[in-house]
Amino acid sequence: MLCRRFLPPSASRHIAALVCGAGVSWPDVRLAPRRVLVGSSISIALVPHLGEGDQAVLFATRFGEEPEVVNWLETAAPHHYDIVLEIGANNGFFSVFLDALIRSMPSAKLRSVVSFEPSLEAFQRLLANLAANDAVHVSPFRAAVGTAAGFQAFFMPRGHLANGSLLRSFAAQCADEIDEQTVAVIDAASLEYFFTGIDRALLKIDAEGYEPQILQSLDPLIERHRPDIVIEVLAATAQAIEDFAARAGYRRFLLTPAGPQTRERVSADRDFRDWLLCAARTGEV
C-alpha cells in the first residue's frame, strides 16, 4: 500500500523488481483485486498475479499496459462503434476497460463488448476481472476464432500465459516447455450473429502469430460489414496483414502514444506492435 500511494513511480518499480523480479519465485497466492487508473483516469480493478504483467497493480495506482492502444480506444471506441469484438482477450484487461468506458459515458454509441479467449487459465482470469469490476457490457466466450469451426490444439508456453497460440511454432519461441489444451474454435459464420443491427464494429485481434489465419477466416464477414480492426503485427505476420489491407482497401495507421500515425504499408515496428486498419469511409480515425 505504501508503494501504491506515497512512493514515486521509480521507487515503486525498484521495490517491484526486488519482490517479483527475475529469479524470485513465489508460491501460487490468491490476491485480492486492486483498483488502478488507466488512460485519462478510468478506474478499473485487476486481480494481480505474482511474476506476471498484472502484478504491477500491487505497486502502483496507475497501470500502463499498452498505453497507445488504451488512449486510442478511449478516444474513439465509445463514439464510433456499436460493438467491439475482442479476439484473444487473455485476462480481460481491455474488456474491463471498455466496460468502464461505456459506464462512464451513458450517451456513448458503444454498448457491447464480446470477448473470446481459448486458454482455460486466461479465461478464468478474465472472468475474475469481469466479476471484480461488476462488468455488465461484456459477453465472454471460452473459444478461439479460426479457419474452421470445431476443436483444435492450443499451445501454452509454460510461464507465459499471454503467449498461448494455435501455432505450436509460436509458443515454442517463448518457452521450452509447452502445455497443450484442446479448445473450441468458431469460424466467421458464427460471428455473423453479433453484426445483426450493427452500424459500425471494431475487431481487436491479438492471437500470437495467428492473426493472418483469422483475417483469412473473417474475409467474407469483413467484406460484408467493413469493421475497423486493431491488430497486433509482428515481423512474421506483417506481410500477410499488409496483403490483406491492400486487398481489402483498408487504410493503415500505426498506434503510438502520439496517436494513430498514417503509414503506406503495414510493417513490423521496433517500438509498437498494434495497428489500426480502417475501412475506407469519411470521418475521424
Question: What are these model-predicted stretches?
Answer:
Residues 152-159, 265-273:
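Short, surface-exposed amphipathic charged segments that create phosphate/polyanion-binding patches used
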Residues 114-117, 227-233:
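Short internal beta-strands
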Residues 89, 118, 145-147, 188, ...:
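Hydrophobic pocket-lining residues within nucleotide cofactor-binding pockets
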Residues 141-143, 250-259:
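Conserved S-adenosyl-L-methionine
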Residues 1-119, 124-197, ...:
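S-adenosyl-L-methionine
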Residues 60-85, 153, 167-225, 236-240, ...:
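Short internal loop-to-helix segment that lines adenine-nucleotide cofactor pockets
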Residues 120, 209-210, 234-237, 258-259:
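Short beta->alpha connector loops
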